[in-house]
Amino acid sequence: MSPQTETKASVGFKAGVKDYKLTYYTPDYQTKDTDILAAFRVTPQPGVPPEEAGAAVAAESSTGTWTTVWTDGLTSLDRYKGRCYGLEPVPGEENQYIAYVAYPLDLFEEGSVTNMFTSIVGNVFGFKALRALRLEDLRVPPAYSKTFQGPPHGIQVERDKLNKYGRPLLGCTIKPKLGLSAKNYGRAVYECLRGGLDFTKDDENVNSQPFMRWRDRFLFCAEAIYKAQAETGEIKGHYLNATAGTCEEMIKRAVCARELGVPIVMHDYLTGGFTANTSLAHYCRDNGLLLHIHRAMHAVIDRQKNHGMHFRVLAKALRLSGGDHIHAGTVVGKLEGERDITLGFVDLLRDDFIEKDRSRGIYFTQDWVSLPGVLPVASGGIHVWHMPALTEIFGDDSVLQFGGGTLGHPWGNAPGAVANRVALEACVQARNEGRDLAREGNDIIREASKWSPELAAACEVWKEIKFEFAAVDTLDK
């Protein structure tokens, strides 16, 4: 190469490493309505300035790499780069900051949660300059959310399909979760639905194991559903878990469920993956199936307060990817969940427009426009004494799911279902009459138990059961 050519090639390009903050920290940037906005909890390594850490997050999750490259000159970094536009210290924490990052919409493929997460929560989480990193919240602009189908049907369509209004829906996870034969499993499903529940559910672990192959389970559960419907006059459902080792097998199971005429199938969306989940959601919308979503594996991602991703982000991702129900904790049961935080992401699942509210952990105003809502499912360590609190906390647009709280009844499965249905109807009636469920809840249950022996027996069994542990994931004070 001649000296003259070498000089021309090097114009505007200087090899080497430069601080991220020189390019990616832009505190004067005015965010656009079309930007995807992220709030990261950043814990820099000792000696790394917070501005450099925030800029590094913006760079490594968008266009940046560890050194200057000459191909930067072949594109417009100003158009495509992520920008750290704000930093604030976390109250009560040493060396933790909330870094606000804006991403141009053109960085992401339309209708793909997989692509969005590959960038925003990809390699940057292993970056050595950061001791820990957590994605606290994400603002998805309407320009991007409108490229998604979202939930297959949504809350109102589900109520119309089921012809059930004015109260939470009642469910039950069949236990023991593993080991039952398909015939005995179907028997438990029938007894619970016959006793008054709206739904029963496969546990997330139930796929197609040697003790109960999926097709056998589907057939016995369908028989149980039709028998219970005929005897009660109510529409019933069982969440048939279609999760499988391949997308093709998953769709095959969903096709079988549709051919059996059942109303709903189920998917483990984190272990199954967002691509598989979106594919199943599209199939469900096209074929009239409701889709129940289980969040197995979420705590691996969201439970640590300084690293990972908050569940409110996973909830938003699910609303984009597609699901009509999703598990959302209980506040009062055995699983993690502080009240204000839980109600924050419950609103993000159900409502069309959610205002920024840091007291509930919501960092950005979120406008879903017309994307259908998702029913939150309260499940895990709950029983009849929790019914007033659950009805008051979650309201009508929810599913209250009692596994052990139904099947653990001393008289059997059907009386357990009766006890839960009576408790729910008593709480809804009391609320509609203007009574305070939070203050009078126990009295309401005791009054109802006087004319329901099934409820009285349940009250006696679970009167001392509590799960009183402090939540790990709490709001910053």
UniProtKB/Swiss-Prot annotation:
UniProt-recorded name of the protein: Ribulose bisphosphate carboxylase large chain
Upper taxonomic lineage: Eukaryota, Viridiplantae, Streptophyta, Embryophyta, Tracheophyta
General function of this protein: RuBisCO catalyzes two reactions: the carboxylation of D-ribulose 1,5-bisphosphate, the primary event in carbon dioxide fixation, as well as the oxidative fragmentation of the pentose substrate in the photorespiration process. Both reactions occur simultaneously and in competition at the same active site.
SUPFAM superfamilies assigned to the protein according to its UniProt record, in alphabetical order: RuBisCo, C-terminal domain, RuBisCO, large subunit, small (N-terminal) domain
Organism from which the protein derives: Manihot esculenta
Modified-residue entries (N-acetylproline), positions: P3
Positions of post-translational N6,N6,N6-trimethyllysine modification: K14
Residue ranges listed under propeptide: 1-2
Subunit field text: Heterohexadecamer of 8 large chains and 8 small chains; disulfide-linked. The disulfide link is formed within the large subunit homodimers.
Residue positions where N6-carboxylysine is found in the record: K201
Catalytic activity, EC: 4.1.1.39
Binding site for Mg(2+): K201, D203, E204
